[in-house]
Amino acid sequence: MLVILRSVVLFVLAAVAEIGGAWLVWQGVREQRGLLWIGAGVIALGIYGFVATFQPDPNFGRILAAYGGVFVAGSLLWGVVVDGFRPDRWDLIGATICLAGVAVIMYAPR
């Protein structure tokens, strides 16, 4: 159970780093907030690259495939919290399907 908890925490940290980093770059470029925002985004994206290496599963492909589902759900949540985005039912259904896929890929008994 602790291994699963560790894995979930690492997925959340990875999502914050990647989504936050991409959002900072977006703000720097699209919203013309400047190079400091872009630089902070690049650093956050670099941190994301390291976080996945701490996952307990040794398979890069499995971790990144599962993280894709976390990214989908996390991006929608980021939009709600940070940008005032309101997902519709299809967004929520899609995110739920993605998270179910994460659970199967990462935590199914092998």
UniProtKB/Swiss-Prot annotation:
It comes from Saccharopolyspora erythraea (strain ATCC 11635 / DSM 40517 / JCM 4748 / NBRC 13426 / NCIMB 8594 / NRRL 2338). It is found in: Cell membrane. It is a multi-pass membrane protein. The lineage of its organism: Bacteria, Bacillati, Actinomycetota, Actinomycetes, Pseudonocardiales. Belongs to the UPF0060 family. HAMAP family: UPF0060. The chain crosses the membrane at residues 8-28, 34-54, 63-83, 89-109. One of its GO terms (cellular component) is plasma membrane. InterPro entries: UPF0060 (IPR003844). The keyword Cell membrane applies. Keywords: Cell membrane, Membrane, Transmembrane, Transmembrane helix. This is UPF0060 membrane protein SACE_5620. Pfam families: UPF0060.
